[in-house]
Amino acid sequence: MADLKKLAEEIVGLTLLEAQELKTILKDEYGIEPAAGGAVMMAGPADGAGGAAEEQTEFDVVLKNAGASKINVIKEVRGITGLGLKEAKDLVEAGGKIKEGVDKAEAEEIKGKLEAAGAEVELA
């Protein structure tokens, strides 16, 4: 049981790039495909009193598809994240979070740059 807890702590502590590499390894070597949606859903309030929804202040910029101009998207990802060429290429090919926890203005700016380069992007 302690080994499972240690493994869970290591997985939670992965960087974005390490998580992308883990996804690729699980897919290529073990044939494990990521679940649709890829997120764990939390249960809502049991009493039905949701109250007023709070406005989201932090956003994650998620690359859904690099599109036909993958080279342009890689260049933009490098500029946005500061990653090296190989790391940016791996991130673009795997898809996923480009930036986490950014304010709405920055998230919209990044989304605009990536979409101008030909990528399909969503804010979460």
UniProtKB/Swiss-Prot annotation:
Gene3D superfamilies, sorted: 3.30.1390.10, Single helix bin (1.20.5.710)
GO molecular function: mRNA binding; structural constituent of ribosome
Ranges annotated as spanning the membrane: none
Family affiliation: Belongs to the bacterial ribosomal protein bL12 family.
Family annotation (HAMAP family): Ribosomal_bL12
Subunit: Homodimer. Part of the ribosomal stalk of the 50S ribosomal subunit. Forms a multimeric L10(L12)X complex, where L10 forms an elongated spine to which 2 to 4 L12 dimers bind in a sequential fashion. Binds GTP-bound translation factors.
NCBIfam families: L12
Cystine residue pairs: none
Protein name per UniProt: Large ribosomal subunit protein bL12
Keyword annotations of the record: Ribonucleoprotein, Ribosomal protein
Biological role: Forms part of the ribosomal stalk which helps the ribosome interact with GTP-bound translation factors. Is thus essential for accurate translation.
InterPro entries membership: Ribosomal_bL12, Ribosomal_bL12_C, Ribosomal_bL12_C/ClpS-like, Ribosomal_bL12_oligo, Ribosomal_bL12_oligo_N_sf
A GO CC annotation given for this chain: cytosolic large ribosomal subunit
Biological process annotations from GO: translation
